[in-house]
Amino acid sequence: MELVLGLKYIAVALLIGFGAIGTAVGFGNMGGKFLEACARQPELAPSLQVKMFILAGLIDAVAMIGVGIAMVLLFVL
């Protein structure tokens, strides 16, 4: 029984950790591409900024959903 609990804790930690790493990589890539696009075509910066913020919210939502799933695994199952 202790082995199952230990493995469950490791699974939850990996789920939250990899979700955070993936979110950070996604934000970094998106920010870099946004800056490149604004440097190439400055007149498109306002519309690109709106799209970037929408995508940032979606990327962040993926990490929050991962934390929610991890909490269900930790406390319910």
From Swiss-Prot:
Q: Does the keyword Membrane apply?
A: yes
Keywords in alphabetical order: ATP synthesis, Cell inner membrane, Cell membrane, CF(0), Hydrogen ion transport, Ion transport, Lipid-binding, Membrane, Transmembrane, Transmembrane helix, Transport
A Pfam family (short name) is: ATP-synt_C
An example of a Gene Ontology cellular component annotation for this protein is: plasma membrane
Q: What domain of life is recorded for the organism?
A: Bacteria
Q: How does it sit in the membrane?
A: Multi-pass membrane protein
| UniProt site positions, description: Reversibly protonated during proton transport | D60
| Transport recorded as keyword | yes
One Gene Ontology molecular-function label: proton-transporting ATP synthase activity, rotational mechanism
**Principal place where this protein is found?**
membrane
- Tell me which CDD domains the record gives: ATP-synt_Fo_c_ATPE
Q: InterPro entries recorded for this chain?
A: ATP_synth_csu_bac/chlpt, ATP_synth_F0_csu, ATP_synth_F0_csu_DDCD_BS, ATP_synth_F0_csu_sf, ATPase_proteolipid_c-like_dom, F/V-ATP_Csub_sf
Q: Which residues cross the membrane?
A: 10-30, 57-77
Q: Where in the cell is it found?
A: Cell inner membrane
Q: What does this protein do?
A: F(1)F(0) ATP synthase produces ATP from ADP in the presence of a proton or sodium gradient. F-type ATPases consist of two structural domains, F(1) containing the extramembraneous catalytic core and F(0) containing the membrane proton channel, linked together by a central stalk and a peripheral stalk. During catalysis, ATP synthesis in the catalytic domain of F(1) is coupled via a rotary mechanism of the central stalk subunits to proton translocation. Key component of the F(0) channel; it plays a direct role in translocation across the membrane. A homomeric c-ring of between 10-14 subunits forms the central stalk rotor element with the F(1) delta and epsilon subunits.
HAMAP family found in the cross-reference section: ATP_synth_c_bact
| Similarity remark | Belongs to the ATPase C chain family.
Q: How does it assemble?
A: F-type ATPases have 2 components, F(1) - the catalytic core - and F(0) - the membrane proton channel. F(1) has five subunits: alpha(3), beta(3), gamma(1), delta(1), epsilon(1). F(0) has three main subunits: a(1), b(2) and c(10-14). The alpha and beta chains form an alternating ring which encloses part of the gamma chain. F(1) is attached to F(0) by a central stalk formed by the gamma and epsilon chains, while a peripheral stalk is formed by the delta and b chains.
Q: What is this protein called?
A: ATP synthase subunit c
Q: What is the lineage of its organism?
A: Bacteria, Pseudomonadati, Pseudomonadota, Gammaproteobacteria, Alteromonadales
